[in-house]
Amino acid sequence: MQPDPNPAAAPAALIELTGVSKRFPGVQALDDCRFDLRAGEVHALMGENGAGKSTLMKILAGVYQKDGGEIRMDGRAVEIDDPRAAQALGIGIIHQELNLMNHLSVAQNIFIGREPRGRFGVFVDEDKLNRDAAAIFARMRLDLDPRTLVGRLTVAKQQMVEIAKALSFDSRVLIMDEPTAALNNAEIAELFRIIGELRAHGVGIVYISHKMDELRQIADRVTVMRDGKYVATVPMAGTSMDAIIAMMVGRQLDTEFRTPPDTSANDVALEVRGLSRGRAIRDVGFTLRRGEILGFAGLMGAGRTEVARAVFGADPVDAGEIRVHGKTVTIRTPADAVAHGIGYLSEDRKHFGLAVGMDVQNNIALSSMRRFVRRGLFLDARQMRDTAQSYVRQLAIRTPSVAQPARLLSGGNQQKIVIAKWLLRDCDILFFDEPTRGIDVGAKSEIYKLLDALAAEGKAIVMISSELPEVLRMSHRILVMCEGRVTGELRAADATQEKIMQLATQRESTVLS
């Protein structure tokens, strides 16, 4: 596939990266990569997690320094040694984790460290500070009071403040990393409107996202990376999503919805009755069988995560009974749950489930250290390493070695490490809370296959997901919640997105099947 459909007619690049390489200890993160951006365009950057997208953009933003290659702006070679150099060139980046101070006003956040001063240069000129912020908002056609404390804003409004901060440096290049991850549909529409305003002013936007439908709406071109290498640049119009996915993963993905096995005769592994906690969980009951994937669907705040955390002993309950393999058990702490063979993979794996500063080996062994202790005193380091390597092979975890820090792995591989941890604990009941959040399409496919394989081995799985196609693809049965209650149950063969949404927005229980 050609890098550009018609290079001769293409306008001059605002910024151009060629032959860029970057190496970290044990990892070639980038190898001979290229990318260009034109004024007034939205250029999507896509690839599986670990493909090198963020590394390439961090080099452009001055966070990392390249080992080789060239960066040109307006046709002139430039060196970007640090973020200040990038800002001086008019390059801004909006990180997925926003970098704002809640106790300061909007205007103070925008101009922090660069506040206009009064006559004697001692005191901040608050009037000018607020006027300058208002001028940027006028350019964005955004109605936002510069005096408002950032901590009082929604995530969407805070993101607009980050964009305004970047524009305050007269940014001509704006890098957006997964900007809609925490936004609802109305907020996404507002963000796209702002992007349209920026394009009209000639700002070039690099847009990193896994959401194909969004890119269809706003991207002009898309560059695909794979394994730290450049694959292709194609126009978004006229390029199918299947073609882009194939470029991203280097293979065709199995995206067909499969017919789930009949597990209705299997033994019941987990039974929950009358589970309640305030208004968050209200008289919830369900059964889960061996070899079954039970999908939990519902809108944000429906109570799905709360149920999982309650069963796992992470949160107290007011009432309810839990039976494991037919026996009533008492679960007051996660240790109690694990002792009964229940594992929980949190939706926030980086804070709950993964020690990102530790290596792969120690993360896998973290919850099972006792089995590696010899004579009550010494860790059997060799057995721990061999066990970790066995799970790395079994789950196809992509890592140079088990000594690699977990923070350097992609989201999909981090998720596999957490799964390995619970498999090592011999958990046969597993709660997966948003198991594919923040990972790319290729890694999602691998997680799906892994869940299917675990179910085929007899593991009993609850999968909580906000992505309806994912729930429909993976579940053998689907439980729907609304406002803390189970409002319905659907067999996989009868389930549709429409039926799920009907149940997710009603307050009374029913069964559609």
Curated annotation (Swiss-Prot):
Origin: domain of life: Bacteria
Signal sequence range: none
Tell whether Membrane is among the UniProt keywords. Answer: yes
Please name every pair of cysteines joined by a disulfide bond in this record: none
Q: Name a GO molecular-function annotation.
A: ABC-type D-ribose transporter activity
Q: How does it sit in the membrane?
A: Peripheral membrane protein
Localization, per the record, is:
Cell inner membrane
The UniProt keywords, alphabetically, are:
ATP-binding, Cell inner membrane, Cell membrane, Membrane, Nucleotide-binding, Repeat, Sugar transport, Translocase, Transport
Which EC numbers does the record give?
7.5.2.11, 7.5.2.7
UniProt catalytic activity: D-ribose(out) + ATP + H2O = D-ribose(in) + ADP + phosphate + H(+); D-galactose(out) + ATP + H2O = D-galactose(in) + ADP + phosphate + H(+)
Give binding positions for ATP.
Answer: G47, E48, N49, G50, A51, G52, K53, S54
Read off the SUPFAM superfamilies from this record. P-loop containing nucleoside triphosphate hydrolases
* Domain ABC transporter stretches: 15-252, 263-508
Give the function comment from the record.
Answer: Part of an ABC transporter complex involved in carbohydrate import. Could be involved in ribose, galactose and/or methyl galactoside import. Responsible for energy coupling to the transport system.
Family recorded in the similarity comment:
Belongs to the ABC transporter superfamily. Carbohydrate importer 2 (CUT2) (TC 3.A.1.2) family.
Protein name as it appears in the record:
Putative ribose/galactose/methyl galactoside import ATP-binding protein 3
